[in-house]
Every structure is written in C-alpha cells, then in structure tokens.
Amino acid sequence: MFYTLQLNAKLQPFDRHDLEDIIDEFLSKEDLGETSGGGTLMSKEGEIEYCDIEISLNDTANAVEKLLRKLEDIGIPKGSKLYNENFSQEIGSLEGLGLYVNGTDLPKEVYETSDINVVFDTVCEILKDILVLTSYHEGSKDTALYFYIKGNFAEAKEQIKDFITTYPLCEKSRIVQIA
C-alpha cells in the first residue's frame, strides 16, 4: 500500500531527505516497507509550504500503527498527516518557530558586522534541550530560520527573546508560529 506523509514543515530537500532516511531505515529494519521519494511545495514567493515523503508499506498487520508510533517517536510537526485514498490521520507533536531575519531594511554596517550563522547557532544553543528539526530559507527580503521543538511555541519564543532583542541583525525580525 502506498501512503504519503505530508509534513507540516518548511524543510529544505536535504533536511527532508535526512528524515526520509530515518523512516526508510526503520521500515527496512522492521520489514514494513520503504520510502520511495518525496517532494516539496513552494509558495509563489519561493518559501517552502510543506513537504511530502512517499512510503510503500507492506500489507502486514499493524504496519500503519507501527509507522505512526515511530513517527511520533522521531518527532514531526503538528498538522502533518499520513494518508492515501482510503486512510487519513493527522499526526505530529512538534511546534514550529519561524524566525524571519530582515535582509534589506537595516543599516549597511549591521549586515557587514553581523552573521546569520551566529543567529542560527545561538538560537539552536538556547533551544538545544527541546530542539528536534531545523531548516532555513533565503528569500529576497529576509532569511527564515525554522526551529521545530518538543514543547511550547510561546515558551520557546520567550527563551530566545533576550538574544533577539540584543543582536543587531535581529532588529526588525519577525517570529511566527509555523506548526
């Protein structure tokens, strides 16, 4: 049976592929099936809306239930779903925080003396105990950094607030719940 795992996640293809590999290893080890590819839906602006992983499950007892349990163990974003023409189930427990760093409206010297990698690494360090997945998108007006966490979006936003309000590159940034 073929299924689609639609991830409510803004993952770059290589980040999605890492997750696909974890799922494929599990399916192979448990003799349940295999992944057979994936895809990414982009918005008009070029930002990732969501991504899919295609899964071929053997028609064995409890294959879907075992896969669903594994997906919850791995951690995938809220609002994701596993489905085919005869089945659909929403899954996911991770909340998502999108940090959109302004790339056009700050003084030139801020861009010359600040580093987006410092922002990414610092937020990862602050959230390290609850962080599960990360990705990013480089747009024409901003760079979006995506953090998927075990926990509460509002609490994660509060945890990074001091850094965001003091690091010059984060001036005029936006924080959005993405899952």
Report each predicted region and the residues it spans.
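Surface-exposed beta-loop interaction hotspot
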Residues: 69-120
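Short, hydrophobic beta-strand segments
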Residues: 3-9, 47-54, 95-105, 143-147
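Short amphipathic alpha-helices in soluble, non-transmembrane regions
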Residues: 19-23, 63-74, 119, 157-165
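A generic structural motif
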Residues: 34-41, 80-86, 171-179
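A common structural junction motif
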Residues: 27, 31, 71-79, 163-171
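Surface-exposed, low-hydrophobicity interaction/linker segments
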Residues: 11-36, 101-130
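Short, intrinsically disordered low-complexity segments
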Residues: 31-65, 134-155
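Structured core of small recognition/catalytic domains
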Residues: 131-179
